[in-house]
Amino acid sequence: MDESVILHAERSFLVCRKPVGVECEHELPALLAEEMKCKVDSLYCVHRLDRAVGGVMVWARTPKAAAELSRQVQEKALKKVYFAVCSGIPTPDTGEMRDLLFKDSVKQKSFAVKSSRRGVKEALLDYRVLQTAALNGSPAALVRVALHTGRFHQIRCQFATRGHPLLGDGKYGSRERGCTTALWSCRLAFFHPETHVPLVFEAAPPRVFPWDRFAWN
């Protein structure tokens, strides 16, 4: 890797910047172990990002920290914020998306459904349009998304359901082929697994299409 994937490391946990295209089960732990000069089996995954999605993640380094961070995930004390670039301009420019999602395990895809049944779970997020642009002749929006639930492909499905698939996400209807799925984990907030001090970590997306078409502070 040209730059460090480690953003912060302590005895009980580490925070990394997951590269786009790296899967969480085997490839990312190997990268982290190589950089940390530790064994792969000393790293504990407490949440995941899809292969096509990059950004901030936290990994536990002890069983006790893994249990504590997993508890925070389950109790929604671990807060996740994403940047996304979607086709079209969502209206209103600030709002909430609430859906019932069904995960099709065969197709490895989520679908919004009208009524609850076995396997259906509620999905909730807040979004805010930050900027708009014309990308390859079509309108697109840079959106900040705060997750309140962590459903399978939640952001991808909820935006696509409203006619705004994420750029590069062919699985959910995007026709843009010049990029991978435009979704980035930009901010992670949680409590230190030992001291319980609140922590926040952030990372900007790479300066490649479509992220490089927007102004960043």
Language-model regions, residue ranges each:
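Pseudouridine synthase
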Residues: 18, 28-32, 137-190, 209-210
